[in-house]
A protein has these predicted regions:
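Short C-terminal tail/terminal secondary-structure segment
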Residues: 2-4, 156, 234, 245-258
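Conserved glycine-rich cofactor-binding loop
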Residues: 11, 18-19
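The beta1-alpha1 cofactor-binding region of Rossmann-like NAD(H)/NADP(H)-dependent oxidoreductases
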Residues: 43, 64-76, 107, 228
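Substrate-binding pocket helix/loop in short-chain dehydrogenase/reductase
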Residues: 101-102, 109-114, 202, 214
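Active-site helix of classical SDR
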Residues: 125, 167, 175
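Residue(s) in the substrate-gating loop at a strand-loop-helix junction
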Residues: 151
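Short, small/polar-rich loop/turn modules that mediate ligand/substrate recognition or access, typified
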Residues: 183, 188, 244-246
Length: 258
């Protein structure tokens, strides 16, 4: 008999939820029954997504979050729990990139990428985890889930995005360190490493000459869709993933083998 993931009664915080993968993650978790908290700097787009989710029968809340600002992180997490209840699931998705050679990277470029992808991801996870641990110490039984969104670029260096690769490699090892330290508190921390995914942000690129050459180099000559990550996301968010902790899971259609 088949089983479906049921997240009813869970509260999920999704960062970078205003577009791309973050938007899809929020929709999928809501469809599975979770109450979702949508976090981003672009709150107008979050309000549009909230309306879509509510029109489909889901529950959603909007919080303003700048992951490069520590006080914004603390305020957003506190606001999320005031509005929606205690957080059971964090999808740590905010991310940015630049395209350039490492010899051309400026201090401003470095700070731009690492402040969001690494520092921001760390302090969002830390703030949520501290609250999870506090509840655990108070007798509120876990499980809790933190899902960091890394990248295949964090597992292998890709041309022209070396800085991004470095920041996501840090997220990979950050995930393992968090899993090792926080697992005893009932917090499972895992990372998804997406391959090349067609989103609204990069959609135009796949029709360019460079995009077509890249697709031709992929093992099955195709890029993924946001929905290709649905099953993995739901598994890692669910109670059924209780024995998965500290795992770095590629969802790249075999790109890492090429």
């Amino acid at each position: 008999m088949g089983r479906s993931i049921n997240l009813e009664g869970k509260v999920a915080l999704i960062t970078g939820a205003s577009s791309g993968l973050g938007k899809r993650f929020a929709q999928v978790l809501s469809q599975a029954g979770a109450k979702v908290v949508l976090a981003s700097r672009r709150t107008e787009r979050l309000k549009e997504l909230r309306a879509e989710i509510e029109a489909s029968g889901g529950a959603a809340h909007v919080v303003s979050l700048d992951v490069t600002d520590y006080q914004s992180i603390r305020s957003a997490v506190a606001h999320a729990e005031t509005e929606a209840g205690t957080i059971d699931i964090l999808v740590n998705n905010s991310g940015v990139s630049t395209t350039q050679k490492l010899s051309e990277v400026t201090p401003a470029d470095f700070e731009y990428v690492f402040d969001t992808n690494t520092r921001g991801a760390f302090f969002v996870a830390q703030e949520v985890a501290k609250r999870m641990m506090m509840r655990g110490n108070g007798g509120q039984k876990p499980p809790y889930r933190i899902i960091n969104i890394a990248s295949v670029a964090g597992l292998r260096v890709l041309p022209q995005i070396g800085l991004y690769s470095m920041s996501k490699a840090a997220v990979v090892h950050m995930t393992k360190a968090m899993a090792q330290e926080w697992g005893k508190h009932g917090i499972n921390v895992n990372a998804i490493c997406p391959g090349y995914i067609d989103t609204e942000i990069n959609h135009h690129h796949w029709s360019t000459d460079h995009g077509q050459r890249l697709v031709a180099m992929l093992p099955r000559h195709r890029v993924g869709r946001p929905e290709d990550l649905d099953g993995l996301l739901l598994l890692l968010a669910a109670d059924e993933s209780q024995f998965i902790n500290g795992s770095i899971i590629s969802a790249d259609d075999g790109f890492g083998l090429s």
